[in-house]
Amino acid sequence: GASVILGSATPSLETFYRTSIGEYELLQLPNRANKAQLPKIHVVDLREELKQKNRSMFSRLLKDFICDRLTKHQQIMLFLNRRGYAGFVSCRSCGHVMRCPHCDISLTSHKNGTLVCHYCGYEEPIPQKCPKCGSHYIAAFGTGTQKVEEMVKKEFPQGRILRMDADTTKSKESYESILSAFANHEADILIGTQMIVKGHDFPDVTLVGILAADLSLNTGDYRAAERTYQLLS
């Protein structure tokens, strides 16, 4: 006769469906904690940036915001969305992603020069140009947090930077050390993967930049859209 409460800001589709048919009771919080306001969100299409000769991972708007926060001595978090990254191939010019014609799942690039569907086994050679727009600017996504850190140091040499990922947090002590250092204003910018996204409260963070925000929509997973929503919201 015990009651169980499933707590989540982003419940799975199965759980939400069960509330709609009466199997579960849906309890909702009417207000955000501490009367917090929703942040202002800017979505930038990097394809448009490319047309204006900006080949950086950072949009011009994000660069302006970072400069502004550094000038004001406020803190910044940069999150690289790499959850489930499996080497899919996309066109930087038009955004087209190579997908399996049978499963509609993104194809994974392999060192032998082929694209493979890990659901049905379909294979095809990696194209030399985009089949949709004809651009030769087509490749597997290959940017990690270390590369982002290098780019930030180059663009913003005045900023103090911490990086938080699997390489820098191999022990519990290092994980807590990075969070403590950022909380104590020993750094201006924290760069990381999904481990920096939820469960932290840094009152002086006034800017969060999500790099490649739509990246995980193209992973070889039929739950890609659901998982992306859970991660970003």
Protein language model annotation of sequence segments:
Residues G1-S233:
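Inter-lobe coupling/hinge segments of SF2-like helicase ATPases
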